Amino acid sequence: MTYQVFDTTLRDGGQREGISYSVADKLAVARLLDEFGVGFIEGGWPGAMPKDTEFFRRARTELDLRHAVLVAFGATRKAGVDVAEDPQVQALLDAETPVVCVVAKSDIRHVERALRTTGEENLAMVRDTVAHLVANGRRAFVDCEHFFDGFRHDPSYAAAVVTTAIEAGAERVVMCDTNGGMLPSMVTAAVHAVVERAGVPADRLGIHCQNDTSCAVANTIAAVEAGVR
């Protein structure tokens, strides 16, 4: 049985207090991760962070990865904006990475309060962005932000975000415990529900757990035992 590791050190790890990578730092860490045999390296958010834009520019000529695939991270198109006209989506394509990972809201409360749009528009944002990336030759991953909190509040909507991404062509959909408040039993139940009720193959799912309650490793193991690869 094969498992794939998607490393977020250069993006999520840089959000930790006291951490600020230079472009040279990011290139050096990427080389080490590649030596470790990591499958995917999330390099940062081009277009949103100037250092990340520069990292991807330099990576084209300065990184010779033998094992890992470099990934650009960003967001779905904005509400009410044509995906082909969204500058942030274009920045993801301009990074010229084989894989692009976009974050999507999967908690309907955040869709309505943070994005200030409807559930249907959010699904369209996911659908349009994934389809656009795939049409432009990219492998698309989707991070479902606050998935488990959203699933506890409205399981049907959270699952709909996953299925929308898969149907649009996403290679992998990552369920995120963004607040780090889940327990292994909650993770197991949510994974089983998405697989059994929504009909999403478990090997198309990923897991990303924060460690606020020191359960990230246990929750990740629970997801893997439930079939996530």
Q: Model-derived features: where do they sit?
A:
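Alpha/beta enzyme core
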Residues: 3-5, 12-41, 48, 56-65, ...
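Pocket-flanking alpha-helical
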Residues: 53
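A glycine-rich helix N-cap at a beta->alpha junction
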Residues: 66-73
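Histidine-centered divalent metal-coordination motifs
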Residues: 208-210
